[in-house]
């Protein structure tokens, strides 16, 4: 079924009209349409003008004079470049599947102005009479084509439809009589969609239809704003470009304040479509589409078959005579909204707009008068059906329309493959067109760009420039003399350096000369010899080439933005000199010049390379060696590029100095090579670090040391010689002498150099077969063990501290007397000691006559074996404290490292007693020569030497950690038993608590001179004294939890007793404040005194026994169980007596005695250090004979009474087990 279209001149029927089978492929298979029709984007710049602005369109549907067959009603989506065989529909039509053909519809004619005026194409309406007929149609609906056209429903039509729908329900014929502007098919389709909306919104009554109608309008932006289908006008697009330049991309709310006629969603969609077309400039044209380039400025296609000179291909609409011999800036004072009209001699007016990057299209057709045939501009109508040069005229056709393509080839046998012409980019902020000397590849289509103004030689001055900066003209006419004779490129404005391909001097090459020009180029790579001062009112050619990204027409990088960045960096240097101005500091100070910090850094790099900033700056990281490396690299690059480009001209030294492209090559090559060289030499790639638990850590290192999942089988990453050997197979280990191996320090970077070498990998310790093989023997006091145990129990992160004591070089014996907790930066898998805290601990230990003999740290929930990081730290300490020692065998002096390390594991699943491991690092290397092997040491434990200071240390730990964010909630019940963390801590402390007696002191002597200082003749301590000691600690930590206020529970209890009398309330308050303290002293009788301090002290006479035990480093001590059974479980609170614990040492915990101290000490304020102890106190203990006299002389003057050290008499040092 065919229908004859109404045309102005009779046209002979085409073969397609006689044979419906040979219809256009679009008729036969809608799926095989042009790829443009398959684009998912639903809007394009073609939709941005009302239909009424196009003089070549008369109504809302179409007809084609060369094919009277009916086209299916298919929406044209994003047809930016409709081809000759593609049907063009209204861009406002919503998507719809192909509908049946009907007899009533509207139509319009496609008017394609053929570029080849000598060929009269009967397939398209190219006659001017057709244009006049179309102009006289006045958008009157026609009934000549049997194809329904989809168009948007206006508000009035929607209102009429709702009224008719309420009256007639689903009677579409009556509804169509009510809405006379729509066909029965359109009404039926709209009624189906409307019924779905009613069902979706749950509206069953026809009386509630108005509610849906109001919601649909409220969902849109506003009644006063145009719908999404309304094309954007010139003014709206101009405001859009200005807002993008002012606020940047993404700030849609701010942009909507400037474009008041659009809401944020419409602006966002418009920006998406706009930037999508801009992004297409960098990619090749689609393989499925033959892109037809619109020539709004009468750019002549290089494959045009007209046999005319290029000088005749001028723009008849704009009368712009492009000078092909000069490239310079044009005067940018044109108003972008002005439009000019010119009569083309045929009665039709062609419209051209100067607005930057607007979506207007020149409509109508233009033809030259006389016999000379001039190419007319191909036009796109705003309604989406603009005229194109048809297949016969330009040889273009749809990629899928093979028949039409062959038809055009038969009429144009000499047509060549079409290459899209690259237009000039336009800077929307200043209306600047950059010359081809530094233009970048631009879009494959200029249909999204307006007319290009002419070049001028005058300097550009922007009205928006407050400093009236001028851009110097650029002379780059060395290769433009052949443009008029160039058969491939007819217009210099379209070439973008493509015209230079046929010349001997290639401006796009980075290096245009051979090795004879290296001397001139190397001068530019040398460091600046003097400081330069730029005129802030102009932009030099050197700046344009060094920072050319700001002069290529990018929306986000404009000359204005470059000026702001450059001026701010120069001002920063003026206020910062002579100190070095770094990129980081500059970027932090520049906030309103875009978010691309890398581009700001490149501007900084350029200004620094030419001597504008950081000239002779203090702390400048650049040196002459860097420039020498750059020169060598540039020379090598020049040699390679010269061989590839065949640039064998040896007499171009002077030209190179004046060539802007060479200057760009020199600057970009120097900057690029410098950045690459610095990356290779100074900035090796590092693993990404994240901030975890107060510490910057490698992301790959997290959860690698231990995976504590709460199951019985915890996965611990252990390192053995075999596993480390497998890790380092890729790296050849170099053999080194034993001297170098012993003195080698292992840094964190050493471990990171291996692909999978984790510095937190745990390494099993080896054990000595015989205790006599140990490098030294060790005694550890009970107060040292208790401090380390409590310190590790109350923190979920690793803790760290120093160990104070004495080393006897004659016997190679270490006595550890004190543990000093230190501040640290901790996480659950690593811990770094605060240097200031470490220095303070050393000074305090030295002030009382002791030395630093070791350090300790905790592994909260994994085995107490060292990691590679611990081995590194221990090795460094041992090398620091290394000293000479006499060998007992041959009396030869050898180096010994008297520095040991303790690792505490408080929380494990093998019992309640904390695991302690004493280690040293030997000089023996592992199989891979990567680290020294750690060994486990056996230790002996001695009684506490100063219980008063032990109380003070425990109190300081409580005060310090009660507000710590990662503290342990001691009130929380443990997972593997019915007891709390506090019970577990008390149980572990009781195993380390050792007191003295003097029953056998007269018969035994301690082998260590430092501990054998005191003779004791005090009374025997009662058995229940140990219970009092543990009870005091338990009462102190009973409210230690992870709440911000430790006294909340007590305060709540007080609130329940508000009805009591005042005396009872006062008593409760005193208890809650924790102000009650007791000081007990007992010889034959006991007396109590209360003071305002919180601490409680008890002193009793010494017991009649003392015990020293050795530990093998496991789950308890090795020794006989000598305590009576009546003390079984007494170190725990009585209510848990019925609980059964698996720890074998729990029932036989060894209790120490607490030495006597005066109550005067507890009336003084607690101090966190022992700096108030006089230096002479310890020095007086040089021997035991004068101790009694020293004690009698100082008993009345010293408030410590018994001084720092108590008077325990130690037993003989036990044998190692």
UniProtKB/Swiss-Prot annotation:
Residues 8-73, 82-91, 99-139, 296-382, 438-454, 475-525, 632-661, 1041-1067, 1155-1171, 1187-1204 have a biased composition (Low complexity). It is found in: Nucleus. Its main location: nucleus. The keyword Disulfide bond does not apply. Pfam families: JAB, Myb_DNA-binding, SWIRM. Residues 525-624 form the SWIRM domain. Residues 140-152, 455-474 have a biased composition (Polar residues). SUPFAM superfamilies: Homeodomain-like (SSF46689), JAB1/MPN domain (SSF102712). Residues 145-199, 225-279 form the HTH myb-type domain. Keywords: DNA-binding, Hydrolase, Metal-binding, Metalloprotease, Nucleus, Protease, Repeat, Transcription, Transcription regulation, Zinc. The keyword Nucleotidyltransferase does not apply. It comes from the Eukaryota. Zn(2+) binds at residues 857, 859, 870. Residues 1172-1183 have a biased composition (Acidic residues). GO terms for cellular component: nucleus. Residues 1077-1099, 1124-1138 have a biased composition (Basic residues). Residues 1-153, 296-424, 438-530, 624-661, 1039-1217 are annotated as: Disordered. InterPro entries: Homeodomain-like_sf, JAMM/MPN+_dom, JAMM_MPN+_peptidase_M67A, MPN, Myb_dom, Myb_dom_plants, SANT/Myb, SANT_dom. GO terms for biological process: proteolysis. This is Myb-like protein H. It comes from Dictyostelium discoideum (Social amoeba). The gene is mybH.
């Amino acid at each position: 079924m065919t229908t004859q279209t109404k045309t102005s001149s009779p046209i002979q029927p085409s073969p397609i009209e006689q044979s419906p089978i040979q219809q256009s492929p679009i008729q036969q298979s809608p799926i095989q349409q042009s790829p443009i029709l398959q684009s998912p984007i639903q809007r394009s710049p073609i939709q941005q003008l009302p239909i009424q602005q196009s003089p070549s369109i008369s109504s809302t549907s179409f007809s084609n004079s060369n094919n009277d067959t009916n086209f299916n009603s298919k929406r044209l989506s994003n047809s930016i470049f409709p081809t000759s065989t593609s049907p063009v529909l209204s861009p406002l039509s919503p998507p719809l599947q192909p509908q049946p053909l009907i007899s009533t519809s509207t139509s319009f004619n496609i008017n394609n102005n053929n570029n080849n005026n000598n060929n009269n194409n009967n397939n398209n309406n190219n006659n001017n009479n057709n244009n006049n007929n179309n102009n006289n149609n006045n958008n009157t609906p026609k009934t000549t084509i049997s194809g329904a056209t989809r168009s948007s429903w206006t508000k009035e039509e929607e209102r009429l439809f709702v009224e008719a729908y309420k009256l007639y329900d689903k009677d579409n014929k009556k509804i169509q009589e009510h809405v006379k502007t729509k066909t029965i098919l359109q009404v039926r389709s709209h009624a189906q969609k409307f019924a779905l909306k009613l069902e979706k919104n749950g509206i069953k009554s026809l009386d509630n239809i108005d509610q849906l109608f109001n919601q649909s309008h409220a969902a849109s932006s506003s009644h006063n704003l145009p719908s999404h289908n309304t094309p954007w006008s010139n003014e709206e697009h101009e405001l859009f470009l200005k807002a993008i330049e002012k606020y940047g991309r993404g700030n849609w709310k701010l942009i909507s304040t400037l474009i008041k006629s659009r809401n944020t969603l419409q602006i966002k969609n418009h920006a998406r479509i706009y930037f999508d077309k801009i992004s297409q400039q960098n990619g090749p044209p689609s393989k499925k589409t033959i892109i037809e380039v619109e020539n709004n400025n009468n750019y002549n296609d290089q494959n045009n078959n007209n046999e005319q000179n290029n000088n005749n291909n001028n723009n008849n609409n704009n009368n712009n005579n492009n000078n092909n011999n000069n490239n310079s800036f044009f005067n940018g004072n044109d108003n972008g909204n002005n439009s000019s009209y010119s009569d083309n001699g045929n009665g039709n007016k062609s419209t051209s707009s100067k607005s930057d990057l607007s979506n207007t299209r020149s409509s109508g057709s233009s033809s030259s008068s006389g016999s000379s045939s001039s190419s007319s501009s191909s036009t796109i109508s705003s309604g989406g059906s603009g005229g194109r040069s048809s297949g016969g005229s330009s040889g273009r056709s749809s990629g899928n329309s093979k028949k039409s393509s062959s038809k055009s080839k038969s009429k144009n046998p000499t047509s060549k493959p079409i290459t899209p012409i690259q237009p000039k980019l336009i800077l929307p902020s200043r209306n600047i067109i950059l010359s081809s000397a530094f233009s970048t590849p631009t879009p494959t289509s200029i249909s999204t760009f307006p007319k290009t103004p002419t070049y001028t030689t005058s300097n550009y001055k922007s009205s928006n420039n407050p400093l009236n900066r001028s851009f110097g003209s650029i002379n780059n006419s060395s290769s433009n003399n052949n443009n008029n004779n160039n058969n491939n490129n007819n217009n210099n404005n379209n070439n973008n350096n493509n015209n230079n391909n046929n010349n001997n001097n290639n401006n796009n090459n980075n290096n245009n000369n051979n090795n004879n020009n290296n001397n001139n180029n190397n001068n530019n790579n040398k460091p600046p010899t003097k400081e330069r001062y730029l005129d802030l009112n102009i932009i030099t050619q050197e700046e344009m080439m060094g920072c050319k990204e700001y002069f290529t027409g990018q929306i986000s990088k404009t000359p204005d933005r470059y000026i702001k960045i450059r001026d701010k960096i120069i001002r920063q240097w003026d206020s910062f000199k002579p100190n070095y101005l770094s990129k980081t500091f500059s970027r932090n100070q520049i906030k309103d010049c875009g978010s691309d910090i890398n581009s700001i850094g490149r501007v900084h790099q350029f200004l620094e390379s030419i001597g504008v900033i950081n000239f002779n700056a203090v702390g400048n990281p650049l040196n002459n060696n860097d420039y020498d490396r750059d020169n060598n690299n540039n020379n090598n690059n020049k040699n390679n590029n010269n061989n590839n480009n065949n640039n064998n001209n040896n007499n171009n030294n002077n030209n190179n100095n004046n060539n802007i492209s060479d200057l760009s090559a020199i600057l970009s090559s120097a900057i690029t090579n410098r950045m690459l060289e610095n990356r290779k030499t100074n900035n090796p790639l590092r693993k990404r670090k994240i901030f975890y638990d107060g510490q910057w850590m490698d992301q790959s290192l997290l959860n690698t040391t231990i995976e504590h999942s709460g199951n019985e089988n915890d996965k611990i990453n252990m390192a053995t010689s075999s596993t480390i050997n497998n890790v380092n197979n890729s790296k050849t280990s170099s053999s080194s002498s034993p001297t170098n191996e012993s003195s080698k320090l292992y840094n964190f970077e050493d471990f990171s150099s291996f692909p999978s070498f984790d510095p937190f990998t745990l390494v099993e310790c080896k054990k000595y077969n015989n205790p006599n093989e140990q490098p030294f023997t060790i005694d550890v006091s009970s107060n040292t063990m208790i401090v380390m145990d409590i310190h590790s129990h109350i923190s979920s992160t690793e803790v760290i501290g120093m160990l104070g004591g004495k080393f006897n070089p004659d016997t190679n014996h270490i006595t550890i007397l004190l543990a000093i907790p230190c501040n640290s930066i901790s996480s659950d898998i690593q811990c770094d000691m605060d240097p200031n805290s470490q220095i303070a601990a050393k000074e305090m230990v030295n002030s009382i006559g002791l030395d630093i003999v070791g350090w300790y740290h905790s592994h909260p929930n994994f085995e107490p074996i060292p990691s590679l990081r611990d081995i590194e730290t221990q090795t460094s300490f041992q090398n620091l404290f290394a000293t000479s020692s006499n060998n007992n065998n041959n009396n030869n002096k050898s180096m010994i490292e008297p520095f040991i390390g303790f690792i505490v594991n408080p929380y494990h699943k093998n019992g309640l007693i904390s695991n302690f491991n004493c280690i040293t690092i030997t000089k023996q290397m592992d199989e891979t020569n990567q680290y020294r092997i750690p060994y486990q040491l056996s230790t002996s434990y001695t009684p506490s030497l100063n219980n008063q200071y032990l109380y003070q240390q425990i109190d300081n730990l409580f005060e310090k950690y009660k507000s710590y964010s990662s503290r342990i909630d001691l009130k929380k019940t443990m997972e593997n038993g019915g007891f709390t963390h506090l019970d577990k801590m008390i149980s572990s402390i009781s195993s380390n608590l050792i007191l003295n007696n003097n029953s056998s002191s007269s018969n035994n002597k301690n082998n260590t001179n430092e501990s054998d200082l005191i003779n004791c003749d005090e009374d025997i301590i009662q058995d229940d004294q140990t219970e009092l000691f543990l009870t005091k600690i338990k009462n102190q930590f009973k409210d230690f939890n992870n709440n911000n206020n430790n006294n909340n529970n007590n305060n709540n209890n007080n609130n329940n007793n508000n009805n009591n009398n005042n005396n009872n309330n006062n008593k409760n308050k005193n208890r809650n404040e924790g102000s009650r303290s007791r000081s007990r002293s007992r010889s034959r009788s006991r007396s109590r005194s209360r003071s305002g301090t919180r601490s409680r002290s008890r002193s009793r006479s010494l017991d009649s026994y003392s015990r020293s035990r050795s530990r093998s480093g496991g789950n308890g001590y090795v020794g006989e169980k000598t305590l009576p059974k009546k003390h079984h479980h007494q170190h725990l609170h009585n209510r848990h007596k019925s609980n059964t614990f698996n720890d074998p040492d729990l029932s036989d915990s060894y209790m120490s005695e607490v030495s006597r101290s005066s109550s005067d000490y507890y009336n003084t304020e607690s101090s966190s250090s022992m700096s108030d102890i006089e230096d002479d106190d310890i020095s007086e203990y040089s021997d035991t004979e004068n101790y009694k006299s020293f004690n009698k002389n100082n008993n009345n003057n010293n408030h410590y009474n018994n001084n720092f050290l108590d008077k325990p008499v130690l037993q003989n040092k036990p044998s190692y087990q």
